């Protein structure tokens, strides 16, 4: 089954906690601190695997969590870092952050990888807090939490040439003739329900990848039929081969079909409409009057399309010449990566411990991630740790902000469940 969209939850590992530990050594206060740092949490990393061609696996597994970092221990032993979690995705996968809908990465080259969730930093052990005055710190830092988010994966197939046209004009037949691909072929509309890829290998020309893009009909840009689901797969192609049924056996007007498909391209993305096209008038073996082809050719040439071929995919008439022209045109069309504008680009938030102060009468409530982390690392009932606590508040600017807010002697400062009286 071809699946080209998925949404999953990813979470990196939290950092391990720093250790509170003391070595046993004579004449060293409390044995001397020797608590090691916690290990870093594992990252969640998406990596391209060229052997994968669909996002089907993500239909069954929706949650990916990396390993936590191990806690530090005595003798200054650092905790082991958590293992990174590698998730394989197909070539051409676009990653978006679900909350912002911003593009995180476009994995369009073999070897590409992207960290979608960075592991938390390990907490510092108590040996890190030793000073000339504080020789036996009885506290350590907890590990930083890992990142978590929902991401959407969108597969936009990578092909040099896209086969374009209404259903049942012979796109799949042409693909099967010029490549080793084996798409489903039958004489009814929408036989092909997913893009098919193949490599064109013809002696004397540079090989290239070609894709049969199904489901494009009038109204596709608004989602009619299979519509937008497959229009986006054309975005990466450098050249389009626009196939029409020149035989008219189904009562269709080839020129009218040509105009309608191009209108859909223009409505979806004007850059697609402006992409180079070769026109392939297919089913010429069933054409009863060559003047029909000549009239069609004249009309499209008047619109500026001068690469028009009369072919029959079924009998292979004109097919090799068509492929040679495509290969020749590709040599002059550069390969360009997907452009991500600054507006669409995802910028990860910097991990910062912040706080805010709210005045409630004579009580000043300090809250935020900074407060949570600080209180998690110390014992406020210990005099030495309490001195460290006040020093951190001073260095962080909390005390200055309290003064600027007009705190008075005897007012209360509250941090979560801990509070103290402010003394000038």
UniProtKB/Swiss-Prot annotation:
Keywords: Cytoplasm, GTP-binding, Hydrolase, Magnesium, Metal-binding, Nucleotide-binding. Mg(2+) binds at residues 172, 192. GO terms for cellular component: cytoplasm. Residues 32-42 have a biased composition (Gly residues). Residues 21-42 are annotated as: Disordered. It is found in: Cytoplasm. One of its GO terms (molecular function) is GTPase activity. Residues 345-424 form the OCT domain. GTP binds at residues 165-172, 190-194, 212-215, 282-285, 312-314. Its EC number is 3.6.5.-. Its main location: cytoplasm. GO terms for biological process: ribosome biogenesis. Residues 159-331 form the OBG-type G domain. Residues 1-158 form the Obg domain. Its cofactor is Mg(2+). Pfam families: DUF1967 (PF09269), GTP1_OBG (PF01018), MMR_HSR1 (PF01926). An essential GTPase which binds GTP, GDP and possibly (p)ppGpp with moderate affinity, with high nucleotide exchange rates and a fairly low GTP hydrolysis rate. Plays a role in control of the cell cycle, stress response, ribosome biogenesis and in those bacteria that undergo differentiation, in morphogenesis control. Belongs to the TRAFAC class OBG-HflX-like GTPase superfamily. OBG GTPase family. PANTHER family: DEVELOPMENTALLY REGULATED GTP-BINDING PROTEIN-RELATED (PTHR11702), MITOCHONDRIAL RIBOSOME-ASSOCIATED GTPASE 2 (PTHR11702:SF31). Monomer. This is GTPase Obg.
């Amino acid at each position: 089954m071809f699946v080209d969209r998925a949404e999953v939850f990813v979470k990196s590992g939290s950092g391990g906690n720093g250790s509170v530990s003391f070595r046993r050594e004579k004449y060293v206060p409390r044995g001397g601190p020797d608590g090691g740092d916690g290990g870093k949490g594992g990252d969640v990393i998406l990596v391209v695997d060229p052997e994968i061609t669909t996002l089907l696996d993500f239909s069954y597994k929706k949650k990916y969590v990396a390993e936590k970092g191990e806690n530090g221990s005595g003798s200054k032993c650092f905790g082991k870092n958590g293992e990174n979690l590698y998730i394989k995705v197909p070539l051409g996968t676009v990653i978006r952050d679900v909350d912002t809908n911003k593009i995180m990465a476009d994995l369009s080259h073999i070897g590409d990888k992207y960290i979608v969730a960075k592991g938390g930093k390990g907490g510092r052990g108590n040996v890190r807090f030793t000073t000339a005055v504080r020789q036996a710190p009885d506290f350590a830092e907890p590990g930083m939490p890992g990142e978590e988010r929902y991401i959407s994966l969108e597969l936009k197939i990578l092909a040099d040439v896209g086969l374009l046209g209404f259903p049942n004009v012979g796109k799949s037949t042409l693909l099967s003739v010029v490549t080793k691909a084996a798409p489903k072929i039958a004489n009814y509309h929408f036989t092909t329900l997913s893009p098919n890829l193949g490599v064109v290998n013809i002696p004397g020309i540079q090989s290239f990848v070609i894709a049969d893009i199904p489901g494009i009909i009038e109204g596709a840009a608004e989602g009619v039929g299979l519509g937008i689901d497959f229009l986006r797969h054309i975005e990466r192609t450098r050249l389009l081969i626009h196939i029409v049924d020149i035989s008219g056996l189904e009562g269709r007007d080839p020129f009218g079909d040509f105009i309608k498909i191009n209108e859909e391209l223009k409505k979806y993305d004007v850059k697609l409409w402006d992409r180079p096209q070769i026109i392939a008038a297919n089913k010429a073996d069933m054409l009863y009057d060559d003047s029909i082809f000549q009239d069609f050719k004249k009309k499209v040439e008047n619109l500026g399309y001068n690469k028009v071929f009369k072919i029959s995919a079924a009998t292979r008439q004109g097919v090799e010449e068509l492929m040679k022209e495509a290969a020749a045109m590709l040599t002059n069309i550069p390969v360009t990566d997907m452009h991500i504008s600054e507006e669409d680009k995802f910028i990860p938030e910097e991990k910062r411990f912040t706080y805010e102060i709210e005045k409630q009468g004579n009580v000043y409530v300090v809250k935020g991630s900074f407060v949570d982390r600080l209180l998690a690392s110390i014992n406020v009932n210990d005099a030495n740790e309490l001195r460290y606590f006040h020093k951190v508040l001073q260095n962080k600017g909390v005390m200055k902000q309290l003064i600027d807010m007009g705190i008075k002697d005897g007012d209360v400062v509250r941090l979560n469940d801990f509070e103290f009286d402010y003394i000038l």
